[in-house]
Regions:
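Active-site alpha-helix of zinc metalloproteases
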Residues: 111, 115, 119, 214
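Cytosolic/stromal cytosol-facing helical appendages immediately following the last transmembrane segment
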Residues: 1-26, 30, 38-41, 46-56, ...
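Hydrophobic alpha-helical transmembrane segments of multi-pass membrane proteins
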Residues: 18-19, 105, 109, 121-122, ...
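Juxtamembrane/interfacial segments flanking transmembrane helices
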Residues: 85-91, 118-135, 196-204
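Juxtamembrane helix-loop-helix connectors linking adjacent transmembrane helices
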Residues: 76-114
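Membrane-helix interface/capping segments
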Residues: 42-51, 80-92, 128
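Interfacial transmembrane-helix boundary/kink motif in multi-pass membrane proteins
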Residues: 48-70, 93-104
Length: 258
């Protein structure tokens, strides 16, 4: 089999892909970091989920691993959408009229549910003691995460995390713009999850909708204690599988009472 069938590399296209991913990440994570950790740090510190701030070496480690993740994400994406031997076999289409606007918008909640399910189960698998140190320990070095922890993955975990792009590309029809729009939302929520501050209002965790939604407090607990709270966007799987920490509601209420 010709090598181009399984691997395609064009530096100009690769640079475009990583610039798009990296630019989006640095703008969002960097902007939020600047707001909470630099400019208004003293004004909002009392409301931080964990009282202490990470150390400078933690920020540096998270940033370096984030850059590594961006490079890996770019390579995988390029070899799907930029490889002429692979792209025709994907479900990605160009003309919205092919499936219509209703379908175009309807796929977004489906993508969210699929990604949340993919994340929950791959996350739990990576917590298995036989592979945790190889795949997931790097991410858990951030026991008090900052926004830069959102992409702070070991290269092996980065491949697993980007596997959802492969699932989407081959599972069901998606317009070429569905993917960047969804992943823009994804990184926004990922950065929020690692923010270190809770943005949802007091009582949200016990509301009809909020009890099913993952929060920054919830994911911060996961980083602090390593066990429980494995979801990404939702708490459906955590509640169904009994992996939501028993002290989650108490922690949420304590943070929001400050």
């Amino acid at each position: 089999m010709p090598i181009q069938l399984i691997f395609s590399f064009n530096f100009n296209k690769y640079f475009q892909v990583i610039s798009s991913i990296g630019g989006r990440y640095i703008l969002i994570a960097g902007g939020v970091f600047l707001f909470f950790y630099v400019v208004f740090k003293n004004k909002v510190l009392a409301k931080k989920i964990q009282n202490a701030l990470p150390k400078n070496k933690d920020y540096l480690r998270e940033f370096v691993y984030s850059i590594s993740t961006i490079l890996i994400f770019g390579l995988i994406i390029l070899n799907i959408i930029g490889n002429p031997a692979v792209r025709p076999h994907t479900k990605i289409y160009d003309d919205i009229a092919e499936y219509g606007w209703l379908y175009y918008f309807a796929v977004f909640p489906v993508m969210l549910i699929i990604h949340d399910t993919y994340f929950y189960w791959t996350h739990r698998i990576m917590h298995h003691k036989s592979i945790f140190k190889i795949f997931h320990l790097v991410h858990h070095q951030s026991t008090n995460p900052s926004p830069w922890a959102a992409y702070a993955f070991h290269p092996m975990e980065a491949i697993v995390e980007n596997g959802i792009f492969i699932v989407f590309a081959f599972l069901f029809p998606l317009h070429k713009s569905n993917l960047p729009i969804f992943f823009l939302f994804s990184i926004l929520y990922n950065v929020y999850g690692h923010l270190g501050w809770e943005l949802y209002p007091k009582g949200f965790n016990k509301s009809i909708v909020g009890k099913w939604v993952n929060t920054s407090v919830c994911h911060n607990q996961h980083h602090k204690y390593f066990k429980g709270n494995y979801g990404l966007y939702l708490l459906f799987w955590d509640r169904l599988m009994g992996t939501l920490r028993n002290d989650y509601d108490i922690a949420f209420e304590e943070v929001k009472s400050r």
